[in-house]
């Protein structure tokens, strides 16, 4: 889990150093947020299935 956090942090740092048009950055941010939400939902579903 810590490695994943480290990887995402370094990826975010790398992405922020690259100059990007504002619109592209906004789209990327939205994609990233959606991806995180989907991951959280999948984790919740897995936990619920394990508990049942």
UniProtKB/Swiss-Prot annotation:
Tissue specificity: Heart muscle (at protein level).
Modified residues (Phosphoserine): 16
Keywords: Acetylation, Cardiomyopathy, Disease variant, Endoplasmic reticulum, Lipoprotein, Membrane, Mitochondrion, Palmitate, Phosphoprotein, Sarcoplasmic reticulum, Transmembrane, Transmembrane helix
Location(s) in or outside the cell: Endoplasmic reticulum membrane; Sarcoplasmic reticulum membrane; Mitochondrion membrane; Membrane
GO biological process: acrosome assembly; adenylate cyclase-activating adrenergic receptor signaling pathway involved in heart process; blood circulation; calcium ion transport; cardiac muscle tissue development; circadian sleep/wake cycle, sleep; intracellular calcium ion homeostasis; locomotor rhythm
InterPro entries xref list: PLB
Gene Ontology MF term list: ATPase binding; ATPase inhibitor activity; enzyme inhibitor activity; identical protein binding; protein homodimerization activity; transmembrane transporter binding; transporter inhibitor activity
Gene Ontology CC entries for this record: calcium ion-transporting ATPase complex; endoplasmic reticulum; endoplasmic reticulum membrane; membrane; mitochondrial membrane; mitochondrion; perinuclear region of cytoplasm; phospholamban complex
Post-translational modification: Phosphorylation by PKA abolishes the inhibition of ATP2A2-mediated calcium uptake. Phosphorylated at Thr-17 by CaMK2, and in response to beta-adrenergic stimulation. Phosphorylation by DMPK may stimulate sarcoplasmic reticulum calcium uptake in cardiomyocytes. Palmitoylated by ZDHHC16, promoting formation of the homopentamer.
Involved in HAX1 binding: annotated span: 16-22
Modified positions (N-acetylmethionine) in chain numbering: 1
Protein topology in the membrane: Single-pass membrane protein
Effect of residue 13 to A: Abolishes phosphorylation by PKA
Lipid attachment locations (S-palmitoyl cysteine): 36
Topological domain ranges for the Cytoplasmic compartment: 1-31
Residues found modified as Phosphothreonine: 17
Transmembrane regions listed in the UniProt entry: 32-52
One Pfam family cited in the UniProt record for this chain: Phospholamban
Record family assignment: Belongs to the phospholamban family.
Known role: Reversibly inhibits the activity of ATP2A2/SERCA2 in cardiac sarcoplasmic reticulum by decreasing the apparent affinity of the ATPase for Ca(2+). Binds preferentially to the ATP-bound E1 conformational form of ATP2A2 which predominates at low Ca(2+) concentrations during the diastolic phase of the cardiac cycle. Inhibits ATP2A2 Ca(2+) affinity by disrupting its allosteric activation by ATP. Modulates the contractility of the heart muscle in response to physiological stimuli via its effects on ATP2A2.
Additional observations: For practical reasons, PLN activity is most often studied with ATP2A1 instead of ATP2A2.
Disease per record: Cardiomyopathy, dilated, 1P: A disorder characterized by ventricular dilation and impaired systolic function, resulting in congestive heart failure and arrhythmia. Patients are at risk of premature death. Cardiomyopathy, familial hypertrophic, 18: A hereditary heart disorder characterized by ventricular hypertrophy, which is usually asymmetric and often involves the interventricular septum. The symptoms include dyspnea, syncope, collapse, palpitations, and chest pain. They can be readily provoked by exercise. The disorder has inter- and intrafamilial variability ranging from benign to malignant forms with high risk of cardiac failure and sudden cardiac death.
Designated name of the protein: Phospholamban
Biological source species: Homo sapiens
Lineage: Eukaryota, Metazoa, Chordata, Craniata, Vertebrata
């Amino acid at each position: 889990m810590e490695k994943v956090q480290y990887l995402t942090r370094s990826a975010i740092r790398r992405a922020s150093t690259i100059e990007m048009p504002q619109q592209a950055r906004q789209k990327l941010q939205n994609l990233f947020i959606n991806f995180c939400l989907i991951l959280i939902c999948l984790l919740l579903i897995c936990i619920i299935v394990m508990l049942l």
